[in-house]
């Protein structure tokens, strides 16, 4: 199968729904790629679902580079997008370009940046440097403190207008796609119609050019998931039951079975 590129994603606009999912390591990158996703997002959500952090704010570049390189070693057909963590691109344009470059050197094929019109200069600089950029508007988790929490966006008119304007500004700046998070569905629909690049929704309705979910949410690894997510499996229960079964067999002397071990020649001679 041919490797998916930025050009392929752009061609899917309005024609074929884009499927994006997060993955943070080699084995899950292999599995989701085998499932046929179009984009693997190495999200800073790893901080919460993998490392147990309370938010994405403490996530560092070193953490993200480790996850990106692990995913890249899976050599997926899907496009690999690395999430730029908090304060890796806001301090200066030079630092943003340097950090985004490290993402690509670690195996990412594009980077994702949160923010609207205030990020235009950074995005332009990255694109000039040859770094593909995915935008992210609506609910931007790295700014949840400023936004007053993880709340719905675009319900009020002034918010809706700002999000629509942000999308247009990001398009002009050169992004190849835009994630729209936890935003009113009609606003996401309007944006999708007005911009020429693909939009990818998460909690923003069915009208975008694609959808994205956090892998741990759709697999049901945790009991609680965001209101816009859907569990397609109950992996939490599968893991618990499997380990319980293993523990039971160890304690009852059932595991290991004869096929799981061998003897030295000394034991064979004793026979």
From Swiss-Prot:
GO terms for cellular component: cytoplasm. GO terms for biological process: coenzyme A biosynthetic process; pantothenate biosynthetic process. Pathway: Cofactor biosynthesis; coenzyme A biosynthesis. It is an enzyme of class 2 (transferase). Keywords: Coenzyme A biosynthesis, Cytoplasm, Magnesium, Metal-binding, Transferase. Mg(2+) binds at residues 44, 83, 114. It catalyses: 3-methyl-2-oxobutanoate + (6R)-5,10-methylene-5,6,7,8-tetrahydrofolate + H2O = 2-dehydropantoate + (6S)-5,6,7,8-tetrahydrofolate. 3-methyl-2-oxobutanoate binds at residues 44-45, 83, 112. GO terms for molecular function: 3-methyl-2-oxobutanoate hydroxymethyltransferase activity; magnesium ion binding. Its EC number is 2.1.2.11. The active site is at residue 181. Its cofactor is Mg(2+). Homodecamer; pentamer of dimers. Belongs to the PanB family. Catalyzes the reversible reaction in which hydroxymethyl group from 5,10-methylenetetrahydrofolate is transferred onto alpha-ketoisovalerate to form ketopantoate. This is 3-methyl-2-oxobutanoate hydroxymethyltransferase. It comes from Staphylothermus marinus (strain ATCC 43588 / DSM 3639 / JCM 9404 / F1).
């Amino acid at each position: 199968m041919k490797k998916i590129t930025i050009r392929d994603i752009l061609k899917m606009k309005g024609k074929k729904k884009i499927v994006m999912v997060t993955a943070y390591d080699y084995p899950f990158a292999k599995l989701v790629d085998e499932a046929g996703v179009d984009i693997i997002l190495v999200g800073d959500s790893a901080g919460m679902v993998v490392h147990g952090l309370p938010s994405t704010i403490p996530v560092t570049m070193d953490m993200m580079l480790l996850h990106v390189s692990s995913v890249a070693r899976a050599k997926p057909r899907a496009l690999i997008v690395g999430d730029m963590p908090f304060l890796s691109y806001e301090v200066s344009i030079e630092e943003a370009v340097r950090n985004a470059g490290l993402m690509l050197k670690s195996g990412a094929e594009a980077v994702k940046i949160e923010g609207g019109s205030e990020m235009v200069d950074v995005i332009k600089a990255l694109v000039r440097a040859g770094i593909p950029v995915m935008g992210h508007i609506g609910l931007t988790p790295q700014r949840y403190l400023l936004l007053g929490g993880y709340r719905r966006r675009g319900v009020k008119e002034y918010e809706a207008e700002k999000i629509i304007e942000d999308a247009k500004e990001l398009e002009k700046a050169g992004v190849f796609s835009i994630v729209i998070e936890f935003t009113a569905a009609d606003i996401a629909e309007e944006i999708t119609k007005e911009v020429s690049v693909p939009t990818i929704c998460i909690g923003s309705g069915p009208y975008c050019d694609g959808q994205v979910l956090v892998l741990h949410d759709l697999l049901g690894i945790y009991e609680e998931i965001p209101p816009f997510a859907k569990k397609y499996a109950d992996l939490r229960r599968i893991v618990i039951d499997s380990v319980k079964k293993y523990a039971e067999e160890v304690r009852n002397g059932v595991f290991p079975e004869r096929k799981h071990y061998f003897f030295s020649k000394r034991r064979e001679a004793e026979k």
